[in-house]
From Swiss-Prot:
<dbReference type="InterPro" id="IPR002500">
    <property type="entry name" value="PAPS_reduct_dom"/>
</dbReference>
<dbReference type="InterPro" id="IPR050128">
    <property type="entry name" value="Sulfate_adenylyltrnsfr_sub2"/>
</dbReference>
<feature type="region of interest" description="Disordered">
    <location>
        <begin position="280"/>
        <end position="302"/>
    </location>
</feature>
<dbReference type="GO" id="GO:0005524">
    <property type="term" value="F:ATP binding"/>
</dbReference>
<keyword id="KW-0548">Nucleotidyltransferase</keyword>
<comment type="pathway">
    <text>Sulfur metabolism; hydrogen sulfide biosynthesis; sulfite from sulfate: step 1/3.</text>
</comment>
<protein>
    <recommendedName>
        <fullName>Sulfate adenylyltransferase subunit 2</fullName>
        <ecNumber>2.7.7.4</ecNumber>
    </recommendedName>
</protein>
<dbReference type="GO" id="GO:0000103">
    <property type="term" value="P:sulfate assimilation"/>
</dbReference>
<dbReference type="GO" id="GO:0070814">
    <property type="term" value="P:hydrogen sulfide biosynthetic process"/>
</dbReference>
<comment type="similarity">
    <text>Belongs to the PAPS reductase family. CysD subfamily.</text>
</comment>
<dbReference type="InterPro" id="IPR014729">
    <property type="entry name" value="Rossmann-like_a/b/a_fold"/>
</dbReference>
<keyword id="KW-0067">ATP-binding</keyword>
<dbReference type="Pfam" id="PF01507">
    <property type="entry name" value="PAPS_reduct"/>
</dbReference>
<dbReference type="GO" id="GO:0004781">
    <property type="term" value="F:sulfate adenylyltransferase (ATP) activity"/>
</dbReference>
<comment type="function">
    <text>With CysN forms the ATP sulfurylase (ATPS) that catalyzes the adenylation of sulfate producing adenosine 5'-phosphosulfate (APS) and diphosphate, the first enzymatic step in sulfur assimilation pathway. APS synthesis involves the formation of a high-energy phosphoric-sulfuric acid anhydride bond driven by GTP hydrolysis by CysN coupled to ATP hydrolysis by CysD.</text>
</comment>
<comment type="subunit">
    <text>Heterodimer composed of CysD, the smaller subunit, and CysN.</text>
</comment>
<keyword id="KW-0547">Nucleotide-binding</keyword>
Amino acid sequence: MAGRELSHLQQLEAESIQIIREVAAEFDNPVMLYSIGKDSSVMLHLARKAFYPGKIPFPLLHVDTGWKFKEMIAFRDAQAKKFGFELLTHINPEGLAQGINPFDHGSAKHTDIMKTQGLKQALNQYGFDAAFGGARRDEEKSRAKERVYSFRDRHHRWDPKNQRPELWRTYNGAVNKGESIRVFPLSNWTELDIWQYIYQENIELVPLYFAAKRQVVERGGQLIMADDERMKLAEGEQFKEELVRFRTLGCYPLTAAMHSEADSLEKIIEEMLLTRSSERQGRLIDSDQSASMEQKKRQGYF
């Protein structure tokens, strides 16, 4: 009897599950980085499938900044309660004490201290030797050249010239003490693949991904939503109600919404089939050339 041919999404799913299982078997202390976005939700779903009916054998880590959307934090806690996974949270105590924020200190400094340094603190504190991330190669050019097993030195830095060959899905996870690997099971997925898989598997998401009327202010050609009373308005700025959704999620002052009527998964997929703009155009941290994604990753970013 001829073997059953896997669909495109089934092939991606099988590849990702194999990577997750291999890391769990190969490394002593792995962790899954959980940013609460759509890619993290897919990665969590794959991890649950990989070890079903057992529990996920490693913790999930959320590096908080204090500036995430309230709906993201509520969703994170609800998912942990629903699925019973071990959830670790960390926020940079020095940055918190200094009052680091995106309004007064700018996106580059805020991202470095609260995200990059915060992540490195958490990895050092728990001694993780492998960290799963939800990055995909189609997102951004520096991620396009990163391996599935991304080697990091003792300071969590990435050197794009010091990468290991990955032939026939064979991964080299050998590390010395203090070194680690960032692992990207979704490397070969596209944004459209993610949305189609979410639809197929009925994966829950933060409601911010769906179009709704929200209070936003136009700033630098971008629509920024006020999520709490800390939102600062410049002279002449005022809030207006717009029908918008978020294509990507992060710290709310640094994440722009987009005009959209896509209030369902079907409509979002249709929108993705027609769009020609970058997924990360709404991430204000990517607009600073001096703090490009590759430079951030060299310093230890996700």
